[in-house]
Amino acid sequence: MRPTAIHAVVAATAAAMMLTGCASDKPPVCDSLDAVRHSADELRNANISENGMSVVTSDLSQLKADLAQFANDAKTQFQPQADGLRSTVDQLQSSVEMAKAAPTAASLGAVRTAVTAVGDAARDLRDAVAGTC
C-alpha cells in the first residue's frame, strides 16, 4: 500500500472513531438529569385519589435520590436551578406530611400545588442543562 493510501485509511478510521465517540459521550449530568425528569414526571402523574399518598411519598423519595445524584454530577455548574428544585421538593415534602396528618381538601390541594411547582422547577433545570446535553 502506498503511504498516501495508508494516511487516508488512518485518517478515515480516526475520523470515524471521533464521530462515534462524540455521539455516545455525554456528561454524567445528562443521565442524572434524565433520571430527575423521569422522577418528576412520575410525581406529576401520580393519581393521589386512586393510589393515596403512598405513591407520592415513594415518587418523592425517588426524586430526592435522583436530585442528589444530579447535584453530585453537576457540582456547582447548575447549582441555582438544582437548589430551586430542591426547595420545591422540600415544600412538597412538607405538604405531603401535612396531608397525611390531616387529609382534607385543602391539604390535598396544597400537595397538588406543590407538585406543579416541582414540575416547573424541573423544567427550569432541564432548560438550564439543555446546552450541555
Spans of features found by a protein language model:
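Surface-exposed, polar/charged faces of alpha-helical domains
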Residues: 27, 31, 38, 42-120, ...
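Residues in flexible loops and secondary-structure boundaries
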Residues: 9, 14, 37-38, 51
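Bacterial signal peptide processing site
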Residues: 22-25
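Sec-dependent bacterial lipoprotein signal peptides
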Residues: 1-20
